[in-house]
Structure formats: structure tokens, C-alpha cells
Amino acid sequence: MNILSQDIMYLPGVGPNKKDVLNKELGVRTWGDLLEYYPYKYVDRSRIYAIHELQSDMPFVQIRGRILSFEEFEMSARKKRVVAHFSDGRGVVDLVWFSGAQYVYKTYKVGEDYIVFGRPTVYGGRFQFSHPEIERASELQLSEMGMQPYYVTTEQMKKRNISSRALEKMVKTMLQKITEPIPETLPDFIVNARHLVSRDTALRCVHYPKNAIEMQKARERLKFEELFYVQLNILRYASDHRRKFRGYVFSQVGDDFHRFYSENLKFELTGAQKRVVHEIRDDMRSGRQMNRLLQGDVGSGKTLVALMTMLIALGNGYQACIMAPTEILAEQHFATIQEFLRGLNIRVELLTGQVKGKRRHEVLDALIAGEVKILVGTHAVLEDPVRFQRLGVAVIDEQHRFGVAQRARLWAKGENPPHILVMTATPIPRTLAMTIYGDLDVSIIDELPPGRKPVQTIHKYDSQMTSLYAGIRQQIRLGRQVYIVYPLITESEKSDLKNLEEGYAALCDIFPEFKISKVHGKMKSKEKDAEMQKFVSGETQILVATTVIEVGVNVPNASVMVILDSQRFGLSQLHQLRGRVGRGADQSYCILVTTYKLSAETSKRIDIMCETNDGFRIAEADLKLRGPGDLEGTQQSGIAFDLKIADIARDGQIMTIAREEAQKIIDADPTCTSSEYALLWRRLRELRDTNVNWAAIS
């Protein structure tokens, strides 16, 4: 039996009680699990300072000396402050405790030799350490002359006396028991080529490094291994998918494409649009099913690229569909596509929940007869009665609004799965895209059409609302429209709904000469769409809303976006909301209104928004500030967010190298059966068998 698979209960010092807590709180069930529960930080314990060397700006330091005496000071009727005067023979400091007096007197004795560890501060002209860590100098230090590891613990663990120090002792005991080298999980050729330390060295040094260099090498090796297997799993899945699912071969672009390009397209495509169309064209004639993610900021021209993709399908005798997450966005796509195709005799139909009865039957019959060439819809397209004669291309707008299972249901609409183009206006950082959409090829439209004025973003405090209202009035009198957004409403945040309702009432008093619409997530769909339509048509001048307007609403006449309490929104969400304006020829503005009291992180978010309109810069910053698990849509992917040591936001370079190595393996062994790589495939099976998230990719 592999020693790493032993039950954690049988590690000396654990037993059945602590075993239950470790299982429940950390998911640690075996020795191997504990070995892979990595420290979150380290403190250098290799140096002992003299008291006269201490400075007030030092972080954690350690000193050695003796307790000279104790003193007590009354803080209140029930509370005492205990002070131990501590000397190393050349200076004196105070060790201070604000609670636990009995424990202090019982544990620490005058005249004994101790090593004290903590953060020095100055009080009353003298250095002091509040609630320091203290060890007898005569006892062997766990981390003597090295880096001390610190582990995350929970309240339940602390109740059972499982502190970071206790975990450190458990790991030390375990490593002493593991006398054989820990088995390698990477082939020698990768370890040597990438100058990695062995797995045995990495796992021992990540818990007990002698110095910062040793710690860094250990962590780099373990991060690489983790990200390598994530990428190997994703690329194996993609390779398997390509072998199993052949795609329709579209050998020509066809007359519809040529007529549209030469007769209906009134402007030049950007260089980025041309590049992406070529990438899509190459996919469609390759004989494999296209699975491509198209990223582009708001207004970059993704819908036009999607339309040209669908026209290629039509030119080869197939049908196409485009699915949007909301009815109003589907209606906008329908109107845009009809306008683009005016005079080309291509039948385009709309299918949403609002298309009912006789009209719905007409659309469905024409679809299966092949008369409808392009279908625009919502998730209604996925319903069983919807049948195409020959579906060749499916475009999915705002992928994170559709579950993976829904995407798969599209494949059942024809004899072969259609080519899939996934579009998103939510920029995804490259490292995250490698993980979430690792099975998709990625295209990026990274330039806006010429002449588009960037939105000007301005930060205002809530005390400046009077001048803000004057600016809104001026814009509306110039013929523009305005969004005013309140924070997202959830069932647990009743006050936000009240704020929106109160805000709406107040705005009606402030702007009696203008018409105001109101939209939020608690409204019935029909009521919400009716209010939205009033704003889209220009019947109302102000739209008071929550973030239900975040995706896809296109009102070129709207030139002002006011986001109240914007400190409560993430960067990507703020950027998406800002994307609702700046769609016309006029200068547009995004006003971020906050309270005066802002955390450092919030101030940074606001500053980034005011500095740049680049969605990819914003997405990278958002990933670093919030982490991948918080980003919208990532939880649906089920991929790789159970990382134990790697950080997708900060380990992009390691991720890229890991993907390169994984791709080499897949290229050399696409069927994953070669005995040369048996070690890798065995390890990958182990990871998928023990990790729910890994299994989800497969």
C-alpha cells in the first residue's frame, strides 16, 4: 500500500477526533492530501535580532533572551493587561498580553531562556510585542535556520486545537515517516527540459524550505505540475472531440457572402475583423467541427463577423442560427441582421418565447423545410420541436448565459454537429481563457471601427448629485438619453429594491419635464420588456435600472451612464455597463458615483475604469483583484478552479509553458494510448477520479 494513501487518522498526533475536523474543514483524508495542503505564506526564522537592532517599521522578527519580571495593569473591572519585561542582555522590550493572564503565568517563567517571535511596535517610548509566539530556546525549533510555513485554518479547527503550528508539526511528523522518495509524476524529459526539481524535493521543500530560493523552486515545480495536468486534460478532451466529431466542409464562401460584401456592406472591415473571418473560414473548410470563441469589446463588430460566418454556411447549402441570452437582445440581432441583408432575398426569422400559436408553427415548418435560412432566437431554439433541415452553423452570443449542456443540445439538431461560434463581449484574460475555454480556439477583435469616440469616464461622490443632475438635464435637452443604474437586487438585499423605487420617485420629482422608465430583476418579463422598449424607441428619456441592462442593449442615442454606489460593482461589470453607451456618433459619458469612504481596492477599481476603455486590460486587472472564481461565468465551466497552489491570475507565464508541454504530448500521442506516456495518462486518471471539477471536463 502506498504510504501517501494511508488514512490521516493513523498519522501520530491526529486520531479520530482531529481526523473528522481535517476531513470536513480541509478535505484532508489521506497523508497525500495533507502533503498537498500547502502553506499560504512563510516567515524567515533564520535570523535572531538583538533588541538594539529593532526598528518600528520591521515586519515579523525574532529575538532571544530572558524574562526579567511580570507586571499587571488594570484595564477595567474584569480585564488586566499582563506585561513581561524581556532582555537579551543589551536591551529590554515588553511582551504584552491583553487576555489569558493565567495561561501566561502558567507557561512562561522568570529567568528562563526564550525565543520570541512577533511584530515590534513602539508604546511609551519602548518596543513591545503584543501576544507574541514564544518557544523555549532549549527546545529544537521546527523551523530553526529556515522559513516557517503558515497554513490557513478555520474556526472549527482552532476549537479542536489545530492551529497553523499544529499542522506544521503534523507535516513534519509525516515527512519523517516517509523514508522512501515520493514518486515522480512528470517524465524525466519534462523535468530536465524545464529545469524543475524532483517531486520529492518539491514536496519536502514547499513545507520546510531553508531559504527563499529553495521555497521558490519548490513552488514553481508544483505550480507547473498542477497547470500542466489541467492543460493536458483540456487538450486531451479537445483532441478526442476533434477525432469523434467531423465537421461539415464548407469549400466556398458562396454567392450570398459575395453579394453582401460587395453590395450591402457600406464600410471597410477593420483589420481585426478581416483576420478573424479568415480564421473562421480556415476552420470551416478543414473538415473538423469549428469550436471557436470570439472575443471583442463592446462595439468592435462581432455581430457582423457572426453574420458573415452564417452567410458562408448559406453559401454551402446549410442553415444558420444565432442565439442570444435575452429576448430583447435577440430582437436587436434580428433587426440588425435584417437591415444588413436588405434586398438579398434571404429569409431570416425570429423565434423567442413571445412567438406563439399559428406564427410559431409557420416558423417551425419553414425551418424544417429549409425555407428559413437564418434563425435568430433565445434558448427557445433548443426546444425539442425546433428542427432544422440542415443546420451548419450555430452562433452563441454571451456564452456564460448558456450552460454547457445547452450548447451540447444544439449538436442534436442535425446529423453532424454544426460549426460553433461562441461570442462574448466580456473580455476574458488569456490565461483564464486557456482554462475556461481551453477546448475552444480563440479569436480576438482587438480594434474598434474608426471614428468611434471613446467613452469618457468620470468619478463623482454622492455629495455632487446636484451638479450631476444639471449635466443630465443638459444632455437630454440636446436630444440624448440617460441610464441610471442602482446596485443589483437580490432577495437578501431588500434595501436595494427600496433604493431603486425611492430613486425612481425622486427622479420623477427632479425631472418632471422628462419621461422615465424603470426596469429591475423583480419585474415580470413582459413588463420589463415593455419598459425597455419605451427607452429603445425614444419614448422615455431616462432609464432607471439594475444590472439587467448589462448585456446587449443597443440604444445609440443613449450618451450617459450613471452608476450609483459603483463601489459595489466589480471591474468587469462596470465595464459592461459602460458599454451600453458610446454606440452613436456623439461623445458619451460614464459617471461612477461612490461614497467618500473607499477601500484601497475599490479606489484602484475606480482609477482603472477612469484610465482605460480597454476591456482586456480591465479583465486582467479584475482577475488579479478578485481571483478567477469570482469572475462572471467561470463557475459554470467546472474547470480547474480547485487549484491547490497555482494562481491563474499571477502564474500566466507558468501556464503558457505548461500548455506548450501538454500540447507536445497530445501531438505525439493524440489517442492517449502510447506506453511512452503511460505515467502521464495514469496520473491524469488519478486526478480525474479524485477531483469532481476535473471529471466535469471529461
Go through each PLM region and give its residues.
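Accessory helical-bundle/CTD segments and flexible terminal tails appended to RecA-like ATPase motors
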Residues: 513, 532-542, 549-556, 561-564, ...
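OB-fold nucleic-acid-binding modules
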Residues: 37-68
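Inter-lobe coupling/hinge segments of SF2-like helicase ATPases
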Residues: 275-278, 289-607, 671
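Flexible hinge/switch segments at interdomain interfaces of large molecular machines
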Residues: 247-256, 446-449, 584, 632-637
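Upstream accessory/linker segments immediately N-terminal to the RecA-like ATPase cores of bacterial MutS
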Residues: 73-264
